[in-house]
Amino acid sequence: SAVLIATISAEEFTWAWADPELKNTAAARLAGNLARFGVDEVVPELVRPHLPLQLARGRQLPHLALPILGIWTLAGTTLADGRVGLVLLDAPQLQLPEPTPAATEATLAITPPAWIDAARARAAYGSFRGVDV
């Protein structure tokens, strides 16, 4: 399955839930959960419909969608109108194998960006991968 989460045009990043041409499509419908999460968890970047592209890239906003929607493969594609569509893909072939101690250790050794709560990120990783952190 594929979930369209955002579009990129020129210097603007637009969440799919806010894109007038796409928001009612089956592919973009799930993206509305990102805005709801943003309201519930006070994440302004998920609630603002349009953001400067540099901000979206700097904050790695598309990657926020992965744990929220529970889909872990992010891809870009060119839409019919020439914009870039950011899509989350899910299929059995894309599922991660069971975590190994070495993989868990390597993942937890990565320092998250300063604007991310490291303890919360570690806890989320442990929860999603079913490992003690």
Predicted regions and their residues:
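N-terminal membrane-targeting/anchoring modules of bacterial envelope and secretion proteins
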Residues: 1-30
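Surface-exposed beta-loop interaction hotspot
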Residues: 19-120
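C-terminal structured interaction module
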Residues: 114-133
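Long, contiguous hydrophobic alpha-helical segments, chiefly transmembrane helices and signal peptides
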Residues: 1, 86-87, 122-126
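Short, solvent-exposed coil/turn segments at beta-strand boundaries
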Residues: 8-10, 69-70, 79-81, 128-132
